[in-house]
Amino acid sequence: MRHARGYRRLNRTHEHRKALFANMAGSLIEHEQIKTTLPKAKELRPIVEKLITLAKRGDLHARRQAAAQLKQDSHVAKLFDVLGARYKDRQGGYVRIMKAGFRYGDMAPMAIIEFVERDTSAKGAADRARLEAESAADES
């Protein structure tokens, strides 16, 4: 019987799962849309929804709780400064999951997870800024 099985283990240890979702939540906050497998997306959604709720609270304790779950301070800053303000009037449902076919090679079901009312220019913006900074450093 599968009573009281509250989450998917995804064939990973607790530490690996914790690191996986910290990285994925950070990527979703940074790019506002990521493509991953459907089970990972379904597990990521409640984690990110709780982080947005913390960002809407906006106090120091909430910021520290979010920083404990995320790996980079820049993700915490964007979460509280941009996303918390964007969703201050929305009562939940900050993230949508759309099925995206199957992965070639192992036929794993894929999904796109994204913020509702997302900023379409955010996807890849950090990568472009990093590349421009590296090229400017190489030239000088």
Curated annotation (Swiss-Prot):
Keyword list (alphabetical) reads: Ribonucleoprotein, Ribosomal protein
Claim: Ribosomal protein is one of the keywords in the record: yes
Is Chloroplast included in the keywords of this UniProt record?
no
Question: InterPro entries annotated for this entry?
Answer: Ribosomal_bL17 (IPR000456), Ribosomal_bL17_CS (IPR047859), Ribosomal_bL17_sf (IPR036373)
Q: From the UniProt record, which GO molecular function terms apply? A: structural constituent of ribosome
Q: Which domain of life is it from?
A: Bacteria
Which cysteines are disulphide-bonded? Answer: none
One of its GO biological process terms is: translation
Q: Name one GO cellular component term.
A: cytosolic large ribosomal subunit
Similarity annotation:
Belongs to the bacterial ribosomal protein bL17 family.
Q: How does it assemble?
A: Part of the 50S ribosomal subunit. Contacts protein L32.
Q: What NCBIfam families does the record point to?
A: L17
Q: Name it.
A: Large ribosomal subunit protein bL17
Species of origin reads: Paracoccus denitrificans (strain Pd 1222)
Please spell out the taxonomic lineage of the organism that makes this protein. Bacteria, Pseudomonadati, Pseudomonadota, Alphaproteobacteria, Rhodobacterales
